């Protein structure tokens, strides 16, 4: 069944415009939207949390195929678990159902808040350079589009995103994965061992309606390291 609409949800420090190469390469006949998530781009002044944002997204776009990368995947998963009637298909790329153990989640929350203070101290430009220099983004080219989209963010917006929507703020959704009934595609880059393990486990818990795919030659940022390959994966899945 062809979805009525496709919604693409970006990762931390990005914005909806980062999806342009993927959108141009997709062959689906459905209209495609790529909104800015809270704290990013045109939504830099928004400080909505994960739950409220997922409710707003479901209301805004209605029944759609949802494609989420990293942070965007956590938003997409919230939409799917809270509003399953709004999700015809679900693609989760390089993402997680949350941090399960309370002490680990508390430690991550503290680290996220410390990082938020650092962002406010150093400013958006230096922080984005630091962020994208992490080994997990080694395969990501700093294209003019990538630089332009990230430059539309603000230090306060990114800091507030961590404080309201960071992984440390999210309640784990692992126990809800078996309740998902829509077709689900879980994707991770072959060089991203951590999210390969997480993705494989997520797909196993979802069940027979889920497929786990490893993107060869890619790291964490699969859609932006290999936009054509990712677009082909998603387009084939939505047919």
Map each language-model feature to its residues:
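Active-site glycine-rich loops that stabilize anionic/oxyanionic intermediates
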Residues: 11-14, 70
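Active-site loop/oxyanion-hole signature of alpha/beta-hydrolase fold enzymes
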Residues: 20-24, 33-67, 232
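Conserved serine/cysteine hydrolase catalytic core
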Residues: 153-204
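Flexible "cap/lid" loop of the alpha/beta hydrolase fold
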Residues: 81-82, 86-119
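Gly/Ala-rich beta-loop-alpha elbow adjacent to hydrolase catalytic centers
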Residues: 68-72, 76
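Catalytic histidine-centered segment of alpha/beta-hydrolase-like enzymes
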Residues: 218-227, 231
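Serine-hydrolase catalytic-loop signature spanning alpha/beta hydrolases and amidase-signature enzymes
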Residues: 13-21
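The conserved beta1-alpha1 loop
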Residues: 7-11, 188
């Amino acid at each position: 069944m062809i979805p009525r609409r496709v919604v693409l949800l970006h990762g931390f420090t990005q914005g909806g415009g980062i999806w342009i190469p993927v959108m141009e390469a997709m062959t689906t006949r459905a209209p495609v939207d790529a909104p800015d998530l809270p704290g990013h781009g045109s939504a830099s002044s928004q400080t909505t949390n994960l739950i409220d944002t997922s409710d707003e997204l479901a209301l805004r776009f209605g029944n759609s195929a949802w494609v989420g990368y990293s942070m965007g995947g956590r938003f997409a998963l919230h939409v799917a678990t809270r509003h399953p009637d709004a999700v015809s298909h679900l693609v989760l790329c390089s993402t997680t159902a949350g941090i399960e153990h309370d002490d680990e989640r508390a430690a991550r929350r503290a680290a996220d808040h410390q990082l938020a203070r650092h962002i406010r101290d150093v400013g958006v430009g230096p922080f984005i350079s630091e962020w994208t220099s992490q080994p997990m983004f080694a395969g990501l080219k700093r294209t003019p589009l990538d630089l332009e989209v990230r430059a539309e963010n603000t230090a306060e917006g990114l800091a507030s995103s961590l404080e309201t929507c960071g992984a440390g703020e999210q309640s784990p959704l692992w126990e809800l994965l078996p309740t998902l009934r829509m077709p689900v595609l879980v994707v991770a880059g072959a060089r991203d061992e951590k999210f390969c393990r997480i993705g494989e486990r997520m797909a196993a818990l979802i069940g027979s309606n889920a497929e786990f795919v490893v993107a060869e030659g890619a790291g964490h940022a699969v859609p932006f390291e290999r936009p054509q390959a990712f677009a082909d994966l998603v387009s084939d899945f939505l047919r």
